[in-house]
């Protein structure tokens, strides 16, 4: 059984989340470009250890070359590796994209499933990727834990864990559900502009009084 949420954490949550809404009001958008649901799944697989900007450059060509789910499922592995090479870890990613798109056709009639168990049963799909899909395709409240969310949630004292799954459940426990979906994109925006990993602009930060570091 989880211990009750402390007064201090409750106080921070009540102040920090509305401030994020104030400074990043339209942040339920997705940084990865896609037009079809399965394209977001592929883009998210590619985004592991890679910037969203780089993924968007690659998928602009990739989604034209493979315009259907079937074309991905039938792709040549060596060719796919070259197509996505610049995203890094391209051998694993190419294999996972082909296996994943085949599974969608064979097991899910070419449709993306919405439940976390089915999504994470697909090759290359962990909870983070599944939650991106659940948030942006199905509008199911989910917390996506990426490097920005991990780092900044630790700084704010919302969690002291380094484990993305633990962080996800801790944040779900302390945040009202209506904030779950947009917390990730707001924190990414904050992490890119103000709370940068290497050179945080603490003097400009509207959250500095709630920050533990």
Where does each model-flagged region fall?
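Catalytic cores of DNA base-excision repair glycosylases
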Residues: 4-213
């Amino acid at each position: 059984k989880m211990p009750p949420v402390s007064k201090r954490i409750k106080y921070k949550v009540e102040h920090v989340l509305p401030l994020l809404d104030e400074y990043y009001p339209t942040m339920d958008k997705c940084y990865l470009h896609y037009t079809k649901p399965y394209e977001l799944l592929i883009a998210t697989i590619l985004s592991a250890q890679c910037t969203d900007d780089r993924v968007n450059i690659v998928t602009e060509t990739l989604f034209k070359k493979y315009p259907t789910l079937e074309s991905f499922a039938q792709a040549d592995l060596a060719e796919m590796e070259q197509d996505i090479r610049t995203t890094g870890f391209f051998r694993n990613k190419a294999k996972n994209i082909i296996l994943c798109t085949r599974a969608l056709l064979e097991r899910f009639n070419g449709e993306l499933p919405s439940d976390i168990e089915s999504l994470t049963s697909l090759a290359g799909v962990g909870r983070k990727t599944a939650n991106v899909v659940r948030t942006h395709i199905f509008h199911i409240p989910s917390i996506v834990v990426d490097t920005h969310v991990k780092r900044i949630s630790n700084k704010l004292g919302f969690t002291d864990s380094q484990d993305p799954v633990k962080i996800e459940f801790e944040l779900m426990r302390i945040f009202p559900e209506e904030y779950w979906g947009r917390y990730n994109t707001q924190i990414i925006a904050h992490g890119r502009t103000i709370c940068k990993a290497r050179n945080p602009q603490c003097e400009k930060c509207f959250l500095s009084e709630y920050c533990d570091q």
